[in-house]
Swiss-Prot record:
Gene of this entry: DAD2
Keywords, alphabetical: Cell cycle, Cell division, Centromere, Chromosome, Chromosome partition, Cytoplasm, Cytoskeleton, Kinetochore, Microtubule, Mitosis, Nucleus
First-listed, main subcellular location of the protein, grouped into a coarse class: nucleus
Acidic residues: compositionally biased ranges: 101-125
Gene Ontology annotations of biological process type: attachment of spindle microtubules to kinetochore; cell division; filamentous growth; G2/M transition of mitotic cell cycle; mitotic sister chromatid biorientation; mitotic spindle organization; protein transport along microtubule to mitotic spindle pole body
Keyword Cell division tagged: yes
InterPro entries reported in the protein's UniProt record: DASH_Dad2
Bridged cysteine pairs (disulfide): none
Family label: Belongs to the DASH complex DAD2 family.
UniProt protein name: DASH complex subunit DAD2
Subcellular location: Nucleus; Cytoplasm, Cytoskeleton, Spindle; Chromosome, Centromere, Kinetochore
GO cellular component: cytoplasm; DASH complex; kinetochore; microtubule; mitotic spindle midzone; mitotic spindle pole body; nucleus; spindle midzone
Function of the molecule: Component of the DASH complex that connects microtubules with kinetochores and couples microtubule depolymerisation to chromosome movement; it is involved in retrieving kinetochores to the spindle poles before their re-orientation on the spindle in early mitosis and allows microtubule depolymerization to pull chromosomes apart and resist detachment during anaphase.
Amino acid sequence: MSKTNTAIYQKIAEKRANLERFREFKELTDDLVLQLESIGDKLETMNGGTASVALILANWKSVVQSISLASLALMKESNDNNKEAFPEPLVRVRVGQSNEENQDEEEADEEEGVRDSEEVEESTE
């Protein structure tokens, strides 16, 4: 009977050791899940950032060309006249907006202009 008790206690000890290893394994996998989720969030952030950088780089060529054109015009003007020459102002025009959005922006700008002029009148009185 003592041998069977010893065998049973040995099996119980093995099961407890296995249980402890499984608990440790579960803790490690939970930590791994948290780290992978964190990496996933960081990758999403990086993805948004790379999209912004790609957009900037896609427009960079046209920006450099615009600056170059303005500089060339300035050089030609300075060669023709002895007056002090200033570069031509560069204006950004949105091409991808719908007419409705343009009208909304114009109305908002007009309202802001009216408010600004009213504030000026009040301050002068």
